[in-house]
A protein has these predicted regions:
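Bacterial N-terminal signal peptides that target proteins for export
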Residues: 2-9
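C-terminal motif of bacterial Sec signal peptides marking the signal peptidase cleavage site
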Residues: 16-20
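Bacterial signal peptide processing site
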Residues: 22-25
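N-terminal "mature-domain start" segment
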Residues: 28-66
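Short, hydrophobic/aromatic-rich segments at coil-to-beta transitions
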Residues: 40-46, 69-72, 115-124
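Secretory pathway targeting signatures of secreted, lumenal, and periplasmic proteins
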Residues: 50-97
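Signature of long, low-cysteine stretches enriched in small and polar/charged residues
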Residues: 103-151
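Surface-exposed amphipathic alpha-helical segments
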Residues: 144-170
Length: 170
């Protein structure tokens, strides 16, 4: 009888552990959908200021001191995020998307483009190493990148698009 309970307990724990670990495919699908929703929703109200620019930073994000006007380094815990701002590009610009898709050295696992109200945006997941992925979110001349672990892809893409969406350059 004790053996049956032990097997049931082990089987239950295995199911719980497996359910808690999302696959790369699930993280990718959820992350791209999260980025799409963040792109289409109203921009978050800015809660930080960098130079002359207002920006929304989700909880836990901070601005690093060595940032300048066009390259802003953000951090959340041990993760770094680099925000590139090209003020010469309009919100409809596809510059960063075209650069990514023309680079044959990149192994793009999945990407999705978005268009709304004269804005062009995209989110992409690029293989960086066996267990790390480069994430990109962009709208026009604003691009945010990070290196992410698999289990953080969906959450990072959502937060990244919320940040990018909150910035107005033109």
């Amino acid at each position: 009888m004790a053996r049956k309970w032990m097997r049931l307990l082990i089987a239950s724990l295995a199911v719980i552990l497996l359910a808690g670990c999302s696959s790369l495919e699930e993280q990718t699908i959820d992350g791209l959908e999260n980025a799409k929703v963040a792109f289409q929703d109203d921009a978050e109200k800015p809660n930080e200021k960098v130079n002359d620019m207002n920006i929304f930073l989700p909880s836990g994000f901070s601005i690093e001191e060595e940032s300048d006007e066009t390259n802003i380094i953000l951090s959340k815990g041990k993760d770094s995020f680099i925000l590139f701002i090209n003020p010469n590009e309009l919100p409809s610009s596809q510059l960063y998307y075209d650069l990514m898709t023309s680079d044959s050295n990149l192994e793009v696992l999945d990407e999705k483009t978005f268009e709304q109200n004269g804005r062009f945006g995209f989110a992409a997941i690029i293989e960086n190493s066996e267990e790390k992925y480069e994430l990109i979110t962009s709208i026009g001349g604003i691009k945010l990148t990070t290196i992410s672990e698999q289990q953080d892809i969906a959450n990072n893409l959502e937060n990244m698009m919320l940040i990018v969406r909150s910035i107005s350059t033109n």
